[in-house]
Amino acid sequence: LGPRLLTMGGIQLIVIARDYLASLTGQEGAVTSLAFGWMIMQVPETLLGTAIATAMLPTLSEFASRDKWREFRLAIERALRVLIALTIPIAAVMAAGINPLVRAAFGFDADMSTLITWTTRAYLITLTGYSIHEIAARSFYARKEPIFPLYAVIVRLALFIGIGYFGITLFKHIGAPVIAFAEIALLIESIFLFVWLSRRMHEPIVVWSAVAKGMIAAVIGGVTAYLLAAYIPGSAVLTALLGMTIGGIVCLPIIWSEIKLLLKL
């Protein structure tokens, strides 16, 4: 319980550091854009990362208690392949069509809507990291090794502050999106945890095929969504929704083998 509480404390420190860095930019609306951008990114992250990881925890705990480490590794690998293959194209498609939806949903002026849009896009770069981190943390909790997520969040905190401060020092005119991008520290933390986990299980967790398919789907889906939203005449909101829908559909054949793994989780 102690390491878990300290880990949660570390996560809260990151939130505090985020708002402090935003105050250093002197940018009007920086804190607000970070809050809205994070909230938007959390919608797919909660529906995918949190939901899958929460459902998997009892299974992982059972495998760990029975020393079924091969099944434990395969369950993690399947979950990662699903999350990686889904979240990379989802992030690209959302980034392509998000701007008119932000303006319609929140009613801010053009400048504030643009700031929220770019901050959201920066957060969407970290969507995969947030999602796979849900699996990483629960993998160690299932093994009753909560100390490793604690070590990892310390590394994440240091990286976030370092990247964020370096970013606003060099690119202060960009402001909040740079701070949102600093959450890439979470992806680094997740990779760190999975490398650590692989070494403790003596078998590597292999997900490169899902990464490749996700990247290809992201390019095709994102470009499709953007072109449809930009060039089809009509309401900006409707064309953005149409572009995102069709962009998502064209991704499906590319990542279909990973999607089918949902039935095996």
What are these regions (language model features)?
Residues 9-43, 59-63, 99-111, 233:
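Helix-terminus/linker motif at the lipid-water interface of multi-pass membrane proteins
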Residues 35, 56, 64, 68-97, ...:
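Interfacial transmembrane-helix starts/ends
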Residues 49-67, 137:
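Helix-loop junctions and terminal segments of transmembrane helices
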Residues 95-127:
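Interfacial segments at transmembrane-helix termini and the short loops linking adjacent helices
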Residues 136-144, 193-210:
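Alpha-helical transmembrane segments
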Residues 147, 157-194, 223, 227-245:
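Membrane-interface helix-loop junctions in multi-pass transport and translocation proteins
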